[in-house]
Design a protein with these regions (language model features):
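Bacterial N-terminal signal peptides that target proteins for export
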Residues: 2-15
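Axial heme c-ligation environment in periplasmic c-type cytochrome domains
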Residues: 55-66, 79-109
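The canonical Cys-X-X-Cys-His
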Residues: 42-50, 110
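Protein kinase-like catalytic domain
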Residues: 48, 81, 115-118
Length: 118
């Protein structure tokens, strides 16, 4: 029997693989308006902002940390689609919210936009 958590993990792995196989650079062609709309719809701005640390890191910090890593897109895609645990500064852990889209193109655009931030 497949559990919901296992199904989420398998789905996020498939989405990550599809995005990785698409093969274009993360910094080319991100649609900022669409990325921001998906982030807003998914309540990402509750914990993140572009420039300032909130409960989660600023996306510019995320971009700087992952931008030059070969697995950056797959890593971030997995992070926003799998519901993995995240640890907060006060030590408590929560499941990371899952982006509210199953469309690999929308998810990739959000990841590409984050990675494109200077």
């Amino acid at each position: 029997m497949i559990t919901t958590k296992r199904l989420r993990l398998e789905l996020s792995t498939l989405i990550g693989a599809a995005i990785a196989l698409a093969g274009t650079s993360a910094v080319i062609g991100a649609d900022e308006a669409a990325a921001r709309a998906l982030a807003r719809q998914s309540n990402c701005f509750k914990c993140h902002s572009v420039d300032k640390k909130k409960d989660g890191p600023a996306w510019r910090e995320v971009a700087a940390k992952y931008r030059d890593k070969p697995d950056a897109e797959a890593t971030l895609t997995n992070h926003i689609t799998s519901g993995e645990k995240v640890k907060f500064e006060d030590g408590h852990e929560e499941d990371h919210a899952i982006v509210k889209s199953k469309d690999p193109k929308e998810i990739r655009n959000l990841v590409d936009w984050i990675l494109s931030l200077p």
